[in-house]
């Protein structure tokens, strides 16, 4: 009997050791949230704070999605923070100073983001300037343009309700007498069903072609953990005003990029170039065009990030964009994007974003000095990357 218990215990230990990497991010996120829930005196899981967490994370999550593509291709974009700040300022100037319709202003800003991506992508792929140098120069340029654009006015307060609702509004509810936001509950249940369906389908496809998959017990445990996170968050939000529009925007962008990377030739080309660019080129892949797309995509998403940040603050400020790129890069790497390129998922980058922003949010609740916040985030970042590097070597 004792030997049987030891055998069972060692089997569980082996399963955890062999498969923990697959769900480490989710486990870390849950532990961080529980830690701050306890040490903040129950403030972390208050509906108002979870809503605030979503709005805090939205602009970083959008950047992390785009950054994942760049990092998979073994490049980097250091300019995205101030591209976001600059485009947010342009949106505010167009609306408040020149009276441009808010939706037209958003479209113009997205086009500006596209042009920035074309400019930087051309320098990298056509001229041959390294991405690090190109985007570092871009960081200086767009920081200067942000300062110039707000030099005369300073902070510009935004009053357009539609624009502000992007990061301050909530999805409409279905009338009911329960006291809960019913639409949020329904979306949560549908989201869980979609996650289970997609994960099971993905697992079966991998098994069909004899790819490695996690063991069945760990797979089921992972599904339970992910489903529990989604349902708990949705129930908490449903007890207040429901899902914020910022979460919907991030969700739509996430769905688009998940489809792009997993279901299209372009996605396969991105992974192929990141894994071995010479082999991809010999196979007929236009790696310059693919990389150009990634930089254009990144800058457009930076513009979206700038819009969300300006909406959240109800203003455009000269300090907008500061260190955004650091949070985006950290989120992507914490989410499991390989330092060597060729590996990464945008869904995991979102989890990485919530790990970073949950740390920030929780430490703010506990009134931790900003200096210590940077130290803690740095330690978590290097620990996550070190864990990933060691796991890949094994």
Language-model features, listed with the residues they occupy:
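Cytosolic-side transmembrane-helix boundaries in multi-pass membrane proteins
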Residues: 1-32, 154, 192-223, 286-289, ...
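Single transmembrane alpha-helix segments in multi-pass membrane proteins
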Residues: 31-39, 43-98, 120-132, 147, ...
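Inter-helical junctions in multi-pass inner-membrane proteins, predominant
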Residues: 42-52, 151, 234-247, 258-262, ...
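Loop-to-transmembrane alpha-helix initiation sites
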Residues: 56, 131, 159-161, 177-188, ...
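Alpha-helical transmembrane segments within multi-pass membrane transporters and channels
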Residues: 99-140, 352
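Transmembrane helix-bundle core of multi-pass membrane transporters
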Residues: 144-261
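Membrane-helix/interface signature in polytopic inner-membrane proteins
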Residues: 199-214, 255-295
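Transmembrane alpha-helical segments in multi-pass inner-membrane proteins
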Residues: 295-308, 312-375
